[in-house]
Structures are given as C-alpha cells and as structure tokens.
Amino acid sequence: MDFSKTIIRRLAPAAAALVVFFVVSAAYFAPQFRGEVLPQHDVVQYEGMAKDISDMRAATGEDPQWTGGMFGGMPAFLINVAYPAQIVKRTVGQVVKLIDTPAAFLFFAMTAMWLMLLVFGVDPWVGIVPALAYGRSTYFLLIIGAGHITKMWALVYAPLMMGGAWMTLRGNMWAGGALTALTASLEIGANHPQITYYFLLAMSAFWISEGIAAFREKHLGDFWKRTAVLAAAGILAAGSNFSPLWYTASHSKETMRGGSELASTSETSQDGLTLDYATAWSYGRTESLNLLIPDFMGRESATTFSPDGEVAAVLNEYGLRGAAQQLPAYWGSQPYTGGPTYLGAATIFLAALGIALARGRNKWWIVAVSVLMLLLAWGRNLMWFTELAFDLLPGYNKFRTVSMALVVVQWAVPLLGALALMRLWRGEIPRQRLLRALAWAAGVTGGLCLLLAVAGSAFFDFGRAESTGMMTEQFRQLFEANNMQDYLQRGMDAEMGIATGNAMAAERASMMQADAWRSLLMILLAAGGVALFALRRINKYVLTALLAAVMLLDLVPVDLRFISHDNFISARQHQVTATAADKAIMADKEPGFRVFNLTVSPFQDATTSYFHRSVGGYHGAKLARYQDLIDRYLSYRNDAVLDMLNTRYLIVPGDGGQPEAVLRPTANGAAWFVDTIAVAGSPQQEIDLLGETDLKRTAVIAEKDKPYTQGWTASPADTAAVRTIALTEYRPNYLKYEYTAPAESVAVFSEIFYPYGWTAYVDGAEAPCFRADYVLRAMRLPAGQHTVEWKFRAPGWTAAEAVTLVSSLVILLGAAAAIVYWIRQKRKENNPDE
C-alpha cells in the first residue's frame, strides 16, 4: 500500500504536467482535431520545393537527391533528402509524431522545457510554470503560423540538449553524456543550423561559467574530464547526422552562404552573406520593449489602423474613407514582421525575481547569454557589435535574420524565473529578503510598464516624423495625379500629411498604453501571488497553480492576436490547385522546359514548382552563381538568359487578373550545339559576356575549362550540316539525350552545372563535362549518332552513411546503458539489502 502511494506521489506531478500541456495545446489548436488545417506560408512553399522529389520517391522508391523544380535545378540537401542511417531521428525522433501538428509543437516544447528543468533540479510542480512560459511565448505562434517547421522542432529539442550539458558538467557525467549525445543528435537532425548555433553559444557560456568555478574551487581535473565527455557527446551527435552535415557543408560552399565569386552583390560577398543582407531583419533597440509590452511597436506589419480610430477620423474629413485600414500601425525598422517576440510580462517579472534571489553561479551565465543574444538580435542597430561577431564568431556570417537570436532569450527568461521559484519552493529565502526582492522585481518591471502607460509619449514619437513624411509624399502624388495644383500651391499636402502623421502616432501610442496597463496588471497578479506566499497566506502548491494561471492569462490572449480558431481552413481549401494557365502548360509534353511565373514574386515563391520546372523558386541558400544570374539578368527578364534556361512559357496576369500562359518560341531547347567558344578570364567577365554574346551560337567558358575545348573548332561545313540533340527522358537525377552530329561538336545543356555528384556518359562510358554560360553544363561530343546520359548521386554516400550509422548505434547503446544503470540504482535505493 505504501509502495503504491509512493509511486502515485512520484508520478502525480508528471501526469499533471503532461495533462496541462496537452489540454493547453489541444484547446488552442482544437480545429486540427476536426480535420481542419492551419495554412502556413512556408509549408505551402516547401510542398512546391519538394514536389518533384516526393513524386519520384513515391513512384520509384528512389531518392533523387536533386530537384529540377526550382532555380533551374539544385541539390536537395537543404530541401528533402532521405538519410536512412539517421536512426536516432528515425526511432527516438518519432515520439513527436504521437500528436499531430500544430498542437504537437506546443505540447512537446512545454514538455521538453519541463524535462530540462527536472535535470536542472527544479521540482516537477514548479517546472510547469516556466514550461508554460516557454511553450506559450508568442514567437512560437508566429513561426508556427509562418510554417517554419524545422525551426520549431529545433526549439523543441534545444532545452533537452541544454539539460544534457548541465547534467554532464554538474551531475552524473556518464548519464549526462548519454543524454547530451541523444538530444543533440535530435537537435542537429531537426535541420535548423542557426537555432542550434545560438544554443551552442548558450552552452559555451555555461561551460565558461563552470570552468571559472572549477578554477576557483581547484577541481579543474574533474572539469576537464567532464568537458571531454561533453565533447565526445557532441562528436557522436554530429556523427549521427554526419551525412546531412557533410553534404550541407560541402554544398554550402556553392551557395549564397559560401559567398559569390564576383565582387559583392546585393545579397552575397566573397566570404558569405553581406552584412546588409544578413542584418536586414534586425530587432530595433527600442522595439525590444515589446518583449514586455506586446503592442509597443504597433504589433505586426499587416496591422492597420482602426476604422473608427483617430487616423480614420482625420482621413474621413478629407473624404478618404477606408484609407486608415491601408496604413501600417507597425512603426519599427524591420522590413516585415509577423509580430512581437513577447515573452510575457509575468515571465519577465519572475526572471527579475530570479536575478534578485538565485545564487550567482546559477544565474550570471544565464543573464550574460541573454544580454549577448539581445545585442546580436539588434544587428544593424548596433553595427559595431555585429561586425565584431561577424569577424570573431566562426560561421556566424552564414546566417541571416539576426533577430532570431532572441530565441535564446525566450528560453533563458523562464529559466531565471524557475530558479527563483525553486528557492521559494524550498523555503530557502527569509521572509524579509523575499519581500525586498519582490518589491525590487515588481518595481523594475511594473514601474517601467507604469511609466510607459502614463508618459510613453514623452519618450517616443511613435513614428510621427516618418509617417508625416510618408503621408505628405502620398498626398503630393495624389494631387499631382488628379491635377489638383491649387491644393499643392496652398500646401495642403504638407498640412494633411502632418495631421495624418500626428493621428497615426497618437493611435500607436494608445495601442502601446493599453498593453502597458495590461502588462502591469499581469505583473501585479504574479507579484501578488508571491506576496501572499511570502506572508504565508497560501502554500507553495496554490502559488504554483496561481502563477500557471497567470502565465496562461498573460500569454494566450496575445497569442490569439496572431493565430486563432478562425485561421483554420478545410483540408480541401489548403490544397494547391492548378490554374487554367498551369493546365495549358502541362498539356505541352515537350520534356525539360521551364516556366517563369510573373504573377507571383518569382524568386520568393515555390508554388510554380508544384506543377512546372521553374526559373524561380523559394530558398534562403540558392546556388551562388544562380543568385548572380538573378541579380544581373533574370530580375530584368533578359531574353537571352531566359532562352538559355529553356524558358518556354511565361505566366503573366491576363484579363481580369487571371494567370495566362504565354509561349516563348525563342527558347534554346533542352540542349543545343554551338559553333564557337568565348573564353572568359574571370567570373566577372563570364557573367558580363552573357549579355554581349549570341548564346545560341557561342558558349562562354572559364579560362580553367579551356582544355576541354582545346583544338576544337567548328568548320563552316560542320555548322551548316544538320545537327540534332534532344532530351528523350527526364527525371530529377537522370537525363537522357539522343544526338546526331557529322563531326565532333560542343553541346550546351540547359541544366545547372554542379561540381559534385553529376556524372556524364556517352553510350554508357563516362565522359568529361565542364561549365558553360556561367551556370550551365557542356560537353565535347564525338561525331555520329550517340546517347548522352547524366546521372546524379551524392559523392561518398556509402562512407557518409556508414559514419552516420555507427555513431547513431553508439548513441542508442549509450542511452540504453544509462537507462539500465538508472533502473539498477533505483532498485538499490528501494531495496538496500539486495
């Protein structure tokens, strides 16, 4: 009986936590359990990116490892490649599929944070509160709505990885090593290197903190031993993902992330992403206040002004009814934002309490890493620091959207709160000290909210100057377009611009003030609960329940501003459907041609790839040379370059705005023979020559590829003779051509050249190939009637998969050994006489 009670008592908090997390997640995403779907931009884009890959996999069981569907063709390593040897991901990683997404995202994020807190020594009841704060933080809802799936899974696994590092350096070294290897394997396998990178920086801060403590306490030997175990766990975790890491690393050199061979372009430099491109999405220093007050900066880019607010009242006087709903309430500096990274006012209050109460060794590394990540997130708004990070942090210049660094702050702030709650739970804080700390934490956080609610307009102009300038210019253009010169002469454009700008600033200030009062209320509720506990009016269980309720009351209503039940649609509505233009193009059975869709942003949209081989696409790591081609020619619809890419159709807006297919009869075809060779002395000259050369007759090649055509010339008789080459079979990773040529000839293939994995064959025998026309493939072909084949397979595949498999098996065996050891230890504790 006593044994049963003990088991129930031990399992009760775990059961309660899981039930709370499931109910909170399932209730929020209830429509998914009715079969409805949340439309997510990046999910739709991904379906287009991977369409020809998944089609081939379904039809043949073969993984192509290459897509021909977008940007003319590119490796699939950063899109969708099957790695059978990733058995940690394919076994333990399948646990997250017990619940469907999107509810699974929140449930497992909260569960992972809760489990990490257990490792950190936090009581399981206490851990529910910071786990709710982590899983319900608004940024999660923003990325779920956008469809950033890999990012979300990386944020699910990251706390578990941090827990493993904590256990390795502070607890059972071997169990910690096994846990770190397992969870880091899952984290890396989530395939979002930027999130993993940020959390490795956080882990480094913890490691440095532990090293300093070991030096002071004179136990460096033990510290280095634990460090070795942690490093070994990291090596195994990387090894269990060796295949994707290897191919991603080798592929990255050819992408925008590896830099351009040209002088710096708009997005790439010769070493990586340009600083301007990488920092385009930088969090504003002032904007950081929306971590505490959600609508401080006007919410999201799509938020407009109220139809019955101050802006509408001003514009209605000018006869511009409805115009207020077209003007942006957001006044930050980011080019686009889906909303604030709101952490929760109550969460920040608890973090402040943690700073006041937690022991130094436990808190200062967390505070330090939070400050570091906030500074990194500021990007171009603190350029000297960002340049320092670009120069000193290895690999940092490969990432864009530096504001993403706030994900670590989102994790660290609830952790600080957990440290405070744990000291309260254990009764370690004298009442007077607790009340002083409570007053300080509430005074700092609540006082800031109160100050902004009462006098925010004294500190900020809420975008008044920028809005006034923007509206003055718009009114000027309106008057000029309607030949209203008298209005311009009277300065009405400036007068109306000032009035509208003032109204926009005033309405934004009202939004901020409303949320400042709201945040103050949440802080007072949380502080009130802690005060009641300090005065012994409630016990620790009631305090935990009260704070959990405050977390939900604080975060869920803000989350609902971005995703609610109304956002869900039927599964049928979510399907990508072919337009009449798509159907007309698909009726053309000529293999291998491409489509350039001008009814969408062609280089930021992959839906075209759902039905066609697209000139455009959607990807953050395009091949660097193709990005150069976009910057120099494709953005300007250069016909010669579109022809060499075998662009047979344009999709353009037709009558009534409906997409219409337009045939381009000038496309070069899937392959063609050239008469002459133009040799370029540099990559810059290569791309320049594309705009100066008849690419139907001449191939542009680099100086280093000159030996491939050495001694070849096409005689007048050769060029006058009938030469034919045609694509007869196409799959993403296999192309077959039949050709006839009376003499040795050079053929250019309208397929993207990639130096790793593609092999060319003539009549079954391997044959040399080289790059032509900056991005395409070319071959020197023998006279006669022959067959050319191109086959793609990732180089070194067998060896890479072997490393992945062995590392994965070692991790799983280590995890199993740790579990067996733990069970035996528990048996000894319960039965010491055995």
Range-by-range predicted roles:
Residues 3, 131, 147-157, 168-185, ...:
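Contiguous transmembrane helix-bundle modules in multi-pass membrane proteins
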Residues 99-113, 338-354, 409-418, 518-527:
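Hydrophobic alpha-helical transmembrane segments
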Residues 260-264, 555-720, 736, 742:
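Extracytoplasmic
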Residues 13-49, 234-247, 372-375, 448-457, ...:
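Transmembrane signal-anchor helices characteristic of membrane glycosylation enzymes that use polyprenol
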Residues 48-52, 250-292, 470-502, 550, ...:
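Membrane-interface segments at or immediately adjacent to transmembrane helices
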Residues 22-113, 120, 132-155, 269-345, ...:
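Membrane-interface coil-to-helix junctions
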Residues 349, 375, 648, 657, ...:
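Active-site-proximal, structured, solvent-exposed surfaces of multi-pass membrane proteins
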Residues 117-136, 171-177:
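Transmembrane-helix signature of polytopic, membrane-embedded enzymes
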